[in-house]
Structure formats: structure tokens, C-alpha cells
Amino acid sequence: MLNLPVPEAEYINEVLKPSETQQEMVSSFADRAERVRNGNVDPRTDNMLKITNDGRKLALDQRLINDLLPDEPESKVNLCVENAYQVWEESTPDKSTQLIFCDLSTPKADGTFNVYDDVREKLVAKGIPREEIAFIHEANTETKKAELFAKVRSGQVRILLGSTPKLGAGTNIRATCCRTNSNVG
């Protein structure tokens, strides 16, 4: 085992109130669970695993349940965007990088709503150059990963989004990392 120095972490737990839509949906999850427990629904149609998965999606962003629902200003995603933008501004002199972990709603090429694209578009709208925001999923070969990590270490990429399996292990960028946002999902 390597005895590398580990920086001391500051953990911040953000507590958000659910939107009215989220409260209604949680109530509907309880109704669904009751029907499942009572055997009133075919397990292929609905089951506790589906209900739990829908709950995880709802906790992240209600648009993951139905992309026609409104973008709630007080959502986890919007709080992450605000925090990421603030840290980006503060760390600009050092060109430090932030990691944003999101295990649900990874990037899709089919145009459906996903958190990764939503975060990137909102950060770009706030003024962060698009080329400073990357997804680990775009580096789908070892060569592309090495190129991406080099851009991170040089300060060309300042915000890197990824899932825990893809970004959590084997990522050698700690020399420039200033913040990790893992509360997104």
C-alpha cells in the first residue's frame, strides 16, 4: 500500500426542501408501494426496486421522472451549479479543477434530458467557457483519458463531471483538484 498524503476534507451537507411536485410524487410512491405489498400489481409492471429507483431519480431532479416537469430553482442540480460556478470564480487564479460526481442520469446521445448536459449548459450560460467543462464519459479510451487528465492538470479543463465508476478510480489529477461535489446523485 502506498503511503501518499491525503488532504483533509471539509464535508458540507446541503439540505434542500422538496418541491410541491416532489412531495406529490413521494406520496404516489407510497401508494405504489402499498399496491406492491398487497400484491395488487404484476411485479413486472411495478415493484419496490422500480419505486426505489424512481425515488433516487426524484431526489436528484424531478425531470428524470418526467422531462416535461419544471426545472426547480432549488433543486440539487441547481445548487450544484451555483456552488460549482462560485468555486470556479474563486479558483480562477490557480486554474484549479472541480470534480462533480453524478451516478444517475449520465450523458446520452439521444437528446433526452440528463443531468450532465443540464449542468454544462447552465455553467456555460453563467460564463464558464464550454471547453473548460468535460465529461469523463467522453474519454472512452486510455489515450483520450490521458489527454483529458493532462488538460485537467494544466488548467484547460476546470470542471470534470463523471460517475463514481468512471471517475472515482485511477484519476490522477489531485495536484490541481480544489473541490469535489458528490452530492449531485
Residue ranges with predicted function:
Residues 40-48, 92-119:
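Conserved strand-helix element at the start of the C-terminal RecA-like helicase core
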Residues 69-81, 111-116:
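Phosphate/oxyanion-binding active-site loops and adjacent basic polyanion-contact surfaces
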Residues 12, 96-100, 157-162:
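Generic beta-sheet signal
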Residues 21-23, 31, 57-65, 103-107, ...:
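Short, solvent-exposed loop/turn segments at secondary-structure junctions
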Residues 9-11, 128-132, 157, 174-179:
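Short glycine-/polar-rich loops that comprise or flank the Walker A/P-loop
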Residues 120, 124, 129-167:
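Conserved helicase ATPase core of P-loop NTP-dependent helicases/translocases
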Residues 1-70, 86:
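Inter-lobe coupling linker of SF2 helicases/translocases
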Residues 55, 146, 159-185:
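SF2 helicase motor core recognition
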